[in-house]
C-alpha cells in the first residue's frame, strides 16, 4: 500500500478540522466511560507533509476496513492526527509505574492518544495513535515517535500476531518530513495501534500511589466487566482479577521464550492488563542463542535479559498486587486485616510459576515434536536442559536450529546435515541428537507427521534486527516497498515461501554491530 512517491497532505487547523473518513464500525465510550480523572480529552498535534508508509491488511480486517481506504487523503489525515473524524473521541490516559525496578511516578500517556473505541465483529478495538503529539502527561518529552522505531513496532506487532503470541496490533504507519531530535535528527511518524484495551499495570499503580481507592475500584470493575466477566462470579472478584492477569502474563512470557523474543524494557507501565505484548521498543529476536542476551543497550545491568523475563514478569505482578491491595481492605483496617489481604494477593499470584512452567514445557514439546511423558514435565528437563546448554555454548542460530530440527530422521543421522552444520562441535550435537532420537523412537514417532507438526510451530521467518534495519534505511529514502514486502513475509512465518528464502538466512556480519535502545 505504499510506493516511492507517496501522496502527501498538509494539516489543517487541528482545533477546527474534521475528517470525512467514514467508519465501517460502530463506536462505544470504552475507556471514556471512566471519567476525566482517568484521562484528558485533547486533539492530536498536526504533522506537516504527511504520507502513507504502510497499512497492514490483517489489522485492517479486524476493523472491517477496506485496505483501499488507506490511499485516500482522509485516511492519512485521520490516522496521523491532522484532523479528527466525527466518530472519534480522542483522549490521553494517565498512568505511572516502575522503570528498571525503580518507582518513576507518572509516566504517560506521553505521546499516545486514543482516537476511538470500535466495536466490530471481531470484538472491541481501541484505536490509538502513537506519536500524535504532546499530552498533559508528556513530562519533558516531545510527544513524537520517529520513523525508525515506528517501522519496528509496526512490523513486530503484526509478526507476533502471525506467530500466535498475544499482542497489540498495528494498522498503519504514516510518516512526515518533520524533524525529531533523538540521538540524531530523525523524521516523525505515527503508528496506529489496536488492542481491546491499552490499560497497563501502571494505570492501577497510578491511582494506588495517589491513594485514590475509589478510582482504583472503578478501574478494576471496568476491566472485570468488559474483559474478564468470569471474575464477577468469584467470592473475591479482585483476587480473581489478579489471578487471571497472572495466568495471562505467564502464558505470554512462556510464548516469548519459546520463539526467542526479548522485549527489552519490561517496566510495569509496559505490561498489559490483558497479557498482551505491548510497547515494542528495543526488542529483539535471538540470532545466535545466548540465554543471557540483552537486546536493549540502555539495559546496562541486564535486568531485562532474555533469561530474566519470567522472573521480571513475576516481579511486575507483585507491583500490580501491591496496587490492588486497598481493594481488599476496608477503611481503617487493622494490621491483621492487612496481613489477610497480603495473603490473598499471594494466593492469587501463586499459580504463576506452575502455569509458566506448564506452558514452557508445552511449547517446547511441540517444538521438539514429542509428547507429554508419563512422568510429566520433570521427565523432560534433562533433554531440554542439555539442549539449552549446547545451544548456548555453540552459539547456534535459534530460529534456524528449530526449523531444521523438524527435518531429521528418527532412524539415523543421515538427514542431520542442515541442523548439524549449525554446530562448531559436531560431536556434541551427535551426542544430544542420539538422546533425542531415542525419545522419538520410544514414542514410535512417525517422521512425516512429526515434521508437519514441528514446521507448524517453529517459524522460518522472524523479525531479525537486520531485516528491520534494511527496511528502515530504504524507508528513509522514501522507498517503502521493503516494509510492505517484509510485512507480507512475516504474516506467514511458518510457510516455506521459496521466493523469500533470503529473509530466513543467517544474519550478515554487519548485523552484529546493530544496537537498539529506549530512544524512539
Swiss-Prot record:
Domain of life: Bacteria
Residue positions binding ATP: 108, 110-111, 130, 142-143, 193, 200, 279
GO function terms (MF aspect): AMPylase activity; ATP binding; magnesium ion binding
Enzyme class: transferase
Catalytic residues (UniProt): 269
Cofactors that this protein relies on: Mg(2+); Mn(2+)
Disulfide bridge partners, by residue number: none
Keywords, in A-Z order: ATP-binding, Magnesium, Manganese, Metal-binding, Nucleotide-binding, Nucleotidyltransferase, Transferase
Enzyme Commission code: 2.7.7.-, 2.7.7.108
InterPro entries assigned to the protein according to its UniProt record, in alphabetical order: SelO (IPR003846)
Reaction(s) this enzyme catalyzes, per UniProt: L-seryl-[protein] + ATP = 3-O-(5'-adenylyl)-L-seryl-[protein] + diphosphate; L-threonyl-[protein] + ATP = 3-O-(5'-adenylyl)-L-threonyl-[protein] + diphosphate; L-tyrosyl-[protein] + ATP = O-(5'-adenylyl)-L-tyrosyl-[protein] + diphosphate; L-histidyl-[protein] + UTP = N(tele)-(5'-uridylyl)-L-histidyl-[protein] + diphosphate
Pfam families recorded: SelO (PF02696)
Binding-site positions, Mg(2+): 270, 279
Protein family: Belongs to the SELO family.
Role summary: Nucleotidyltransferase involved in the post-translational modification of proteins. It can catalyze the addition of adenosine monophosphate (AMP) or uridine monophosphate (UMP) to a protein, resulting in modifications known as AMPylation and UMPylation.
Protein name: Protein nucleotidyltransferase YdiU
Gene source species: Cupriavidus pinatubonensis (strain JMP 134 / LMG 1197)
Organismal lineage: Bacteria, Pseudomonadati, Pseudomonadota, Betaproteobacteria, Burkholderiales
Amino acid at each position: 500500500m505504499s510506493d516511492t512517491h507517496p501522496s502527501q497532505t498538509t494539516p489543517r487547523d487541528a482545533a477546527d478540522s474534521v475528517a470525512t473518513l467514514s467508519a465501517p464500525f460502530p463506536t462505544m465510550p470504552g475507556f471514556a466511560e471512566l471519567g476525566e480523572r482517568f484521562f484528558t480529552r485533547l486533539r492530536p498535534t498536526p504533522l506537516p507533509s504527511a504520507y502513507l508508509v504502510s497499512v497492514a491488511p490483517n489489522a485492517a480486517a479486524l476493523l472491517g476496513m477496506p485496505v483501499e481506504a488507506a490511499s485516500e487523503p482522509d485516511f492519512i489525515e485521520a490516522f496521523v492526527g491532522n484532523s479528527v473524524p466525527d466518530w472519534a473521541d480522542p483522549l490521553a490516559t494517565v498512568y505511572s509505574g516502575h522503570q528498571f525496578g525503580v518507582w518513576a511516578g507518572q509516566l504517560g500517556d506521553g505521546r499516545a492518544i486514543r482516537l476511538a473505541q470500535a466495536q466490530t465483529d471481531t470484538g472491541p478495538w481501541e484505536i490509538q495513535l502513537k506519536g500524535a503529539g504532546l499530552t498533559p502527561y508528556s513530562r519533558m518529552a516531545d510527544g513524537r515517535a520517529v520513523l525508525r522505531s515506528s517501522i519496528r513496532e509496526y512490523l513486530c506487532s503484526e509478526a507476533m500476531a502471525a506467530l500466535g503470541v498475544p499482542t497489540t496490533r498495528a494498522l498503519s504507519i504514516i510518516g512526515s518530513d518533520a524533524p525529531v531530535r533523538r540521538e540524531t535528527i530523525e523524521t516523525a511518524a505515527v503508528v496506529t495501534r489496536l488492542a481491546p484495551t491499552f490499560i497497563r499495570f501502571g494505570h492501577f499503580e497510578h491511582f494506588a500511589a495517589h491513594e485514590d481507592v475509589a478510582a482504583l475500584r472503578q478501574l478494576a470493575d471496568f476491566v472485570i466487566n468488559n474483559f474478564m466477566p468470569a471474575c464477577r462470579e468469584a467470592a473475591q472478584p479482585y483476587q480473581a482479577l489478579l489471578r487471571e492477569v497472572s495466568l495471562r502474563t505467564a502464558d505470554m512470557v512462556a510464548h516469548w521464550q519459546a520463539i526467542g523474543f526479548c522485549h527489552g524494557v519490561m517496566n510495569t507501565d509496559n505490561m498489559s492488563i490483558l497479557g498482551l505484548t505491548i510497547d515494542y521498543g528495543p526488542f529483539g529476536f535471538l540470532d545466535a542463542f545466548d540465554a543471557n542476551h540483552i537486546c536493549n543497550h540502555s539495559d546496562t545491568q541486564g535486568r531485562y535479559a532474555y533469561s530474566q523475563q519470567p522472573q521480571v514478569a513475576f516481579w511486575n505482578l507483585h507491583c500490580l498486587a501491591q496496587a490492588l491491595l486497598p481493594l481488599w481492605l476496608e477503611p481503617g483496617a487493622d494490621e491483621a486485616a492487612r496481613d489477610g489481604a497480603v495473603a490473598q494477593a499471594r494466593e492469587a499470584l501463586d499459580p504463576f510459576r506452575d502455569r509458566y512452567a506448564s506452558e514452557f514445557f508445552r511449547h517446547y514439546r511441540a517444538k521438539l515434536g514429542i509428547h507429554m511423558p508419563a512422568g510429566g514435565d520433570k521427565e523432560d528437563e534433562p533433554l531440554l536442559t542439555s539442549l539449552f546448554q549446547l545451544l548456548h555454548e555453540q552459539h547456534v542460530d535459534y530460529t534456524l536450529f528449530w526449523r531444521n530440527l523438524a527435518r531429521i530422521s528418527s532412524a539415523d543421522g543421515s538427514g542431520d546435515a542442515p541442523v548439524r552444520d549449525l554446530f562448531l562441535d559436531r560431536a556434541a550435537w551427535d551426542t544430544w541428537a542420539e538422546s533425542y532420537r531415542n525419545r522419538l523412537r520410544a514414542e514410535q514417532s512417525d517422521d512425516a507427521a512429526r515434521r508437519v507438526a514441528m514446521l507448524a510451530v517453529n517459524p522460518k521467518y522472524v523479525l531479525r534486527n537486520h531485516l528491520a534495519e534494511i527496511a528502515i534505511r530504504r524507508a528513509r529514502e522514501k522507498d517503502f516497498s521493503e516494509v510492505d514486502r517484509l510485512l507480507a513475509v512475516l504474516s506467514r512465518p511458518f510457510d516455506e515461501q521459496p521466493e523469500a528464502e533470503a529473509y530466513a538466512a543467517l544474519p550478515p556480519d554487519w548485523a552484529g554491530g546493530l544496537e537498539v535502545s529506549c530512544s524512539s
